[in-house]
């Protein structure tokens, strides 16, 4: 998740090191481990729910990374999200590629957490599919729950963004 705050751009990461699932901030090729260090959070999802982003920013500014990305296995950014809600055919070039027409209402569908793929992991093609659908995908990570959110208030509910594969 890239978070742009006043001073520091933070790139969060979930990863496995020596068989333990952890999370931290990636700076170039070094990771500052945050597991259990910010509000007792044991995962990035936990950090977001505990509203620990500002505290993570302060911690990262004084604790440079010491773990190389060469020593970890990437995990999906948020391995256990509450919901994964997807919007399909949301840009015109992709609609043209699929020989479909633009719908009046967005095409909404869901994914399961187990379908996520982490950075540098292979994407498995289902047997029922002839090919993979190559497209740029982005995740919007919600930090605040809400219902009937006004468009002008929507950004207040977003904690970050990420490239996304599933």
Residue ranges and their predicted role:
Residues 9-106:
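N-terminal non-catalytic cap/leader segment that marks the start of a structured domain
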